[in-house]
C-alpha cells in the first residue's frame, strides 16, 4: 500500500505517513480523510483523486528524506465538501485526532471515527430530507429485496416474482446505495442494464442469510446488516424487520410513476409531490412520500384518513395553529436514532429541548386523545442541564448550564479565579512599572504574556522575560505567570472532562426515552400530513372523494398543471368502459388522461381531490402508456418500449384497474398501428378495465363494442388559426387538424400549403376508390364466380381501394 503514496526519496516513511498508510490499509475502498490540525489531508493517489474531484491545488508533504503529493480540506468546511464527494460516488473514511496535541506523547493518536457512504448516513447536515434507503438484492426463490434507512431505523423487505416488479419497487423507493449479491455482480448483462436504469452507488457485502422467510430475502437482510454494522462501527438502532407485500397496495409501475410525474418531473420542476407538500416537519414529509408510494386498497383505512383531513379542513384555526407549532419541531425520528446510537450532539439535545417545549402547546390544541407521550420530565432535565444555545461539539465546551452540576460549578469558580489573576496582574504591573499602555494578552503559541509598546521599552523591569518582538511592541512573561497559566490549563482540562461526563450522563438518560420520541414523531408526522393535505384542499378548492361502483368526476382538474396556468375543468363518467378520446395534438388529451389518474391516486392516498365532485371505485392499479420514453441507449426503440409497456398492461390489468393509453401504435406504419391499437382496445374492453384511450386512429371510433364510449377534445378553425377549447365533449372528433397544428408549430407556408393539397387529393382519391369498389361489387354475381375468378377479383378490388400512387399527385 505504500506505493499508493507515489512518494520520492530514499528514506523511511515519516511517522505521520506510516500512521496514514496503516489506517488506509484497513479501508482500501474508501477515501481516507486524515486529520492534521485544522485540516483533513489526503496523500499520494488519494490526494490526486481529491484534488481532481474538488478542484484543489495539489501540494506536497516533504520531510527530510521523503516527499509525497498532498491535498486537504479545512475541518470547518468538512460537511460541505463531504456532501460533494458523496454525490460524486466516493466512500469516505474519516480519521480524527482522538487526543489533544498538547497531551500527546509523540505522534498524536488518530482513529477512523466515521465511515460515510450515500446509503448509511446519520449526520443531519448530510442527509436528504426524504428517506435515505440502503437496498440489497439477492436471488433464490424469487428476487429478495430489502431496505434499511439507518437514520430512522426503518427495516423492511419483500420477495418479488419478476425483474420488472423488482425494478418498479426500486424506482418507487429510490435508494441512495444498493448492495448486489455476488451472482448479480458477476452477471455482466444484468449489471449493464441495472446501471443504466439506476445510477446509484453499487457496493459489496457478505450475503449471509439472516432471520426467517424465503432464502433470497434472508440473504438480502443479512447483507444490509453486515454492511450497516461495518459503517456504523457495529452499533445499529433498528426497528423490527417488517415484511411487506407490494400487492397490498395500489399497483404503480415505474412507467406510471414517471408518466404521472409523481416524484420526478418530465419537464419543468413541478411534481405531484411538490404541489402536495405543505408538510411542516421532516418526518411528515417522508410519510407523505410513503403514502404516495403506497396508495391504499381498503376503504376503511382510507375513510379514516379522509375523516382526519376533513377535520382540519373544517377547523381552520386549529389547522393554522397546529401547522405553526409543527414548523418549529426538529426531526425527532432521526434524532431518536442518534440518541440510541450515542451520536447525538449537544446541538441535537438543544433541538430536542426546543421540540419538547412545543409538545404541551400541541396537546392543549389537540386534546389528550391525540396520544402524545408525556416527555415533560426529559424536557425539564434538558432545560436545567443545557445552556440556551449549545455548541455542535462537546469539545467546544460551554454546554452545561451553571448551577446544574456542583462539581463543574466548583471547577469553573476556580478557573475564574485563575483568569482574574491575569486581569489583576495587568493593573498591578501598570502601577508598578509606570507603563500606562501595558496589557495582558493571550495566544495559543505563547500563552499569557505582558505587552509593552516601543515608547516604554526603557521602563521594562529586568525580571520580564522576552518571548516575542513585533514591529512596534514586545511581549514578555514572568515565572509566576507560567505557574498560574499551568493551573488555568489544568482547570480547563478538568472542566472539559467534567462537561463531557455530565453531557454523556444527560444523553444516556435522554436515550431511555428514544422509543417514546419515535412514537411522538410518528403521531406528529401523521398530524402534519393530515394538516398539509387539508391546507392544499382549502387553498386550491379540493373536495372529498366518495367511493362506489362508478367513476364520476365533475369539473376535474390536473393538480400540477392548474398551478402554473389557467385550467379548463372537465367531466368524466364511466363504469368498466373503454373511452376513446380523439382530437388534435395540443388540445389536452394527455392532460385529461393524467388528471383522471392523479385524481384516482390522490383519492386512494387519502387526500381530497381537485374537482367539484368525485365518485370513484377503488382501483387495484393504475397503468399508463403516455408519451415517448425512448431507451435508445439501451438498444430499444420508442416503439419497442411502447409495446413492452402495453404488454405489461395486458398481462396485469384487471377489471378493477385504471388504464391510460396515449397514441398506441404510432411508432410503426399506419396499417400496423391501427391493427395493434384495435387489438389492444378490444382486449381491454373484453377485460372490462376502466380504460381511457387517446388516439388519432379514427377507425377505432367505429368499433362495434358494447361498452365503448367516444369523447373528443374541442377545437375549431378560426381566422387566426386553430383554437383549442380544452373541453372534453361527447362523441368522436370531426377531424384531426394535423395540418393546422403543423402550421401553428411554424412549418414554412409552402410546406403547409403542399400538405393541404396532398391531404385533399388523398381524401378525393379515397372517396373515388371507395365508389369504384362499391360499383364493382354491385355488378357481381357471386354464385357464378370460380375460385380462380374470386381470387383475381380480390386483387382487382384491392387495387381499386388503393387508388392511384401518391407520386402521381402534383401540387
From Swiss-Prot:
Gene Ontology BP term (one): mismatch repair
A Pfam family assignment: MutS_V
Binding residue positions for ATP: 583-590
Key words, A-Z: ATP-binding, DNA damage, DNA repair, DNA-binding, Nucleotide-binding
Keyword Isomerase applies: no
MF (Gene Ontology): ATP binding; ATP-dependent DNA damage sensor activity; damaged DNA binding; mismatched DNA binding
PANTHER family (alphabetical): DNA MISMATCH REPAIR PROTEIN MSH1, MITOCHONDRIAL, DNA MISMATCH REPAIR PROTEIN MUTS FAMILY MEMBER
Family note: Belongs to the DNA mismatch repair MutS family.
Function: This protein is involved in the repair of mismatches in DNA. It is possible that it carries out the mismatch recognition step. This protein has a weak ATPase activity.
Name this polypeptide is given: DNA mismatch repair protein MutS
Organism: Thermus aquaticus
Amino acid at each position: 500500500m505504500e506505493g499508493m503514496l507515489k512518494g520520492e526519496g530514499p528514506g523511511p516513511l515519516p511517522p505521520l505517513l506510516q500512521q496514514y498508510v496503516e489506517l488506509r490499509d484497513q479501508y482500501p475502498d474508501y477515501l481516507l480523510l486524515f486529520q492534521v490540525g485544522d485540516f483533513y489531508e489526503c496523500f499520494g493517489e488519494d490526494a490526486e483523486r481529491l484534488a481532481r474531484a474538488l478542484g484543489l491545488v495539489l501540494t506536497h508533504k516533504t520531510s527530510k528524506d521523503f516527499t509525497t503529493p498532498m491535498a486537504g480540506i479545512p475541518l470547518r468546511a468538512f460537511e460541505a465538501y463531504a456532501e460533494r464527494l458523496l454525490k460524486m460516488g466516493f466512500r469516505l473514511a474519516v480519521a480524527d485526532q482522538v487526543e489533544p496535541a498538547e497531551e500527546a506523547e509523540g505522534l498524536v493518536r488518530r482513529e477512523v471515527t466515521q465511515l460515510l457512504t450515500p446509503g448509511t448516513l446519520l449526520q443531519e447536515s448530510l442527509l436528504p430530507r426524504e428517506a435515505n434507503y440502503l437496498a440489497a438484492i439477492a436471488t433464490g426463490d424469487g428476487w429478495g429485496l430489502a431496505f434499511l434507512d439507518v437514520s430512522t431505523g426503518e427495516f423492511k423487505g419483500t420477495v418479488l416474482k419478476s425483474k420488472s416488479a423488482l425494478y418498479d419497487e426500486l424506482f418507487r423507493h429510490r435508494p441512495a446505495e444498493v448492495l448486489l449479491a455476488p451472482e448479480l455482480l458477476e452477471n455482466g448483462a444484468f449489471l449493464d442494464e441495472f446501471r443504466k436504469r439506476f445510477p446509484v452507488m453499487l457496493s459489496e457485502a457478505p450475503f449471509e442469510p439472516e432471520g426467517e422467510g424465503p432464502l433470497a430475502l434472508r440473504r438480502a437482510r443479512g447483507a444490509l446488516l453486515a454492511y450497516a454494522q461495518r459503517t456504523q462501527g457495529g452499533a445499529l438502532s433498528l426497528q423490527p424487520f417488517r415484511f411487506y407485500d407490494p400487492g397490498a397496495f395500489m399497483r404503480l409501475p415505474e412507467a406510471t410513476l414517471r408518466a404521472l410525474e409523481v416524484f420526478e418531473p418530465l419537464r419543468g420542476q413541478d411534481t405531484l409531490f411538490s404541489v402536495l407538500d405543505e408538510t411542516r416537519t421532516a418526518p411528515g414529509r417522508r410519510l407523505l412520500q410513503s403514502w404516495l408510494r403506497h396508495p391504499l386498497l381498503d376503504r376503511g383505512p382510507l375513510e379514516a384518513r379522509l375523516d382526519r383531513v376533513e377535520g382540519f379542513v373544517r377547523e381552520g384555526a386549529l389547522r393554522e395553529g397546529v401547522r405553526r407549532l409543527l414548523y418549529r419541531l426538529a426531526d425527532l425520528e432521526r434524532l431518536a436514532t442518534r440518541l440510541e446510537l450515542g451520536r447525538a450532539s449537544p446541538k441535537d439535545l438543544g433541538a430536542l429541548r426546543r421540540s419538547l417545549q412545543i409538545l404541551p402547546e400541541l396537546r392543549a390544541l389537540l386534546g389528550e386523545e391525540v396520544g402524545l407521550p408525556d416527555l415533560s420530565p426529559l424536557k425539564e432535565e434538558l432545560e436545567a442541564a443545557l445552556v440556551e444555545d449549545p455548541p455542535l461539539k462537546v469539545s467546544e465546551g460551554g454546554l452545561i448550564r451553571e448551577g446544574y452540576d456542583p462539581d463543574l460549578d466548583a471547577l469553573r469558580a476556580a478557573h475564574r479565579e485563575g483568569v482574574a489573576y491575569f486581569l489583576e496582574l495587568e493593573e498591578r504591573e501598570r502601577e508598578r512599572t509606570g507603563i500606562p499602555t501595558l496589557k495582558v494578552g493571550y495566544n495559543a503559541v505563547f500563552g499569557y504574556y505582558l505587552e509593552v509598546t516601543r515608547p516604554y521599552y526603557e521602563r521594562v523591569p529586568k525580571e520580564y522575560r522576552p518571548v516575542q518582538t513585533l514591529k512596534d511592541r514586545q511581549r514578555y512573561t514572568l515565572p509566576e505567570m507560567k505557574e498560574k497559566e499551568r493551573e488555568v490549563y489544568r482547570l480547563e482540562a478538568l472542566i472539559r472532562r467534567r462537561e463531557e461526563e455530565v453531557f454523556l450522563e444527560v444523553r444516556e438518560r435522554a436515550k431511555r426515552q428514544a422509543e417514546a420520541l419515535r412514537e411522538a414523531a410518528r403521531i406528529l408526522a401523521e398530524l402534519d400530513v393530515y394538516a398539509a393535505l387539508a391546507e392544499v384542499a382549502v387553498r386550491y378548492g379540493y373536495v372529498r372523494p366518495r367511493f362506489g361502483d362508478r367513476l364520476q368526476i365533475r369539473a376535474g382538474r390536473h393538480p400540477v398543471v392548474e398551478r402554473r396556468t389557467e385550467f379548463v375543468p372537465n367531466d368524466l363518467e364511466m363504469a368498466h368502459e373503454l373511452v376513446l378520446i380523439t382530437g388534435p395534438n395540443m388540445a389536452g388529451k394527455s392532460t385529461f388522461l393524467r388528471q383522471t389518474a392523479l385524481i384516482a391516486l390522490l383519492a386512494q392516498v387519502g387526500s381530497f381531490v381537485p374537482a367539484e365532485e368525485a365518485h370513484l371505485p377503488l382501483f387495484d392499479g393504475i397503468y399508463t402508456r403516455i408519451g415517448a420514453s425512448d431507451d435508445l441507449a439501451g438498444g430499444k426503440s420508442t416503439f419497442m418500449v411502447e409495446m413492452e409497456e402495453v404488454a405489461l398492461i395486458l398481462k396485469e390489468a384487471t377489471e378493477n384497474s385504471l388504464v391510460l393509453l396515449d397514441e398506441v401504435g404510432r411508432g410503426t406504419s399506419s396499417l400496423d398501428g391501427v391493427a395493434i391499437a384495435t387489438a389492444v382496445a378490444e382486449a381491454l374492453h373484453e377485460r372490462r378495465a376502466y380504460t381511457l384511450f387517446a388516439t388519432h386512429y379514427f377507425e377505432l371510433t367505429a368499433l362495434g363494442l358494447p361498452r365503448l364510449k367516444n369523447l373528443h377534445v374541442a377545437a375549431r378553425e378560426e381566422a387566426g388559426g386553430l383554437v383549442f377549447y380544452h373541453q372534453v365533449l361527447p362523441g368522436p372528433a370531426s377531424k384531426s387538424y394535423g395540418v393546422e397544428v403543423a402550421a401553428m408549430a411554424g412549418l414554412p407556408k409552402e410546406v403547409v400549403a403542399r400538405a393541404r393539397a396532398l391531404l385533399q387529393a388523398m381524401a378525393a382519391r379515397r372517396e373515388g376508390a371507395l365508389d369504384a369498389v362499391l360499383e364493382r361489387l354491385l355488378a357481381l354475381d357471386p354464385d357464378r364466380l370460380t375460385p380462380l375468378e374470386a381470387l383475381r377479383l380480390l386483387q382487382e378490388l384491392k387495387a381499386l381501394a388503393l387508388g392511384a400512387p401518391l407520386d402521381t399527385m402534383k401540387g
